[in-house]
Amino acid sequence: MGRGRVELKRIENKINRQVTFAKRRNGLLKKAYELSVLCDAEVALIIFSNRGKLYEFCSSSSMLRTLERYQKCNYGAPEPNVPSREALAVELSSQQEYLKLKERYDALQRTQRNLLGEDLGPLSTKELESLERQLDSSLKQIRALRTQFMLDQLNDLQSKERMLTETNKTLRLRLADGYQMPLQLNPNQEEVDHYGRHHHQQQQHSQAFFQPLECEPILQIGYQGQQDGMGAGPSVNNYMLGWLPYDTNSI
């Protein structure tokens, strides 16, 4: 019984797709080699995987020479503006470098997805163990950095606390000195004010009691006229009568 027709379509299962690619690729490379040996043909085979990895086979000594021959056959004799062999070599080298970088980029993306817990199905036991060690190492580094950051913050806060404590202590000392300085300069301020007011009042009383004597050109003996008023008090002439000699003959 013959084998049924296989429907050609993209394989959805990733693992099955990779397995099929590896088998068909090896078979294709084997067929190209057999064709070049059995038929003495110049065969060049270039394969790129879906991840950008390059697989090639060339029956001649140089893939570049086969490509130049292919270009001549398809596009005729090279024109003056056609790149030379050196230019093609540079272009091919650049392309290979690009493929290497792309492969590296894909590997880094794949590693990143694995670290995030994605696409872990195709990984083997050793790869999973290696991934676990990487995660443990990364976790230790993160914890160490976090601890160091917290210690730095704690040291900064302690330094600020010491500065604030010193500032508070200095302000308290200045405030205490400000209260004590007026008392040291004038400790009996209230007494001085009291005596000052008393002395001023005594001066006013003395000035009111002792009136200045007015010198008159004519000495008047006896009381002054009644126009001075009864409540004016004794005058200077009245005081003089007390000590003048009393002349009985004048009466």
Swiss-Prot record:
Where primarily located?
nucleus
Task: List the record's Gene Ontology CC terms alphabetically.
Answer: nucleus
Give yes or no: UniProt keyword Plastid. Answer: no
Gene ablation phenotype (knockout): Triple mutations in the SEP1, SEP2 and SEP3 genes result in the replacement of the stamens and petals by sepals and of the carpels by a new mutant flower with sepaloid organs.
Domain of life of the source: Eukaryota
* Signal peptide start-end: none
Record bears the keyword Transcription regulation? yes
Limits of the K-box domain: 91-181
- Functional description taken from the UniProt entry: Probable transcription factor active in inflorescence development and floral organogenesis. Functions with SEPALLATA1/AGL2 and SEPALLATA2/AGL4 to ensure proper development of petals, stamens and carpels and to prevent the indeterminate growth of the flower meristem. Interacts with APETALA1, AGAMOUS or APETALA3/PISTILLATA to form complexes, that could be involved in genes regulation during floral meristem development. Binds specifically to the CArG box DNA sequence 5'-CC (A/T)6 GG-3'.
- Under what name is this protein listed? Developmental protein SEPALLATA 3
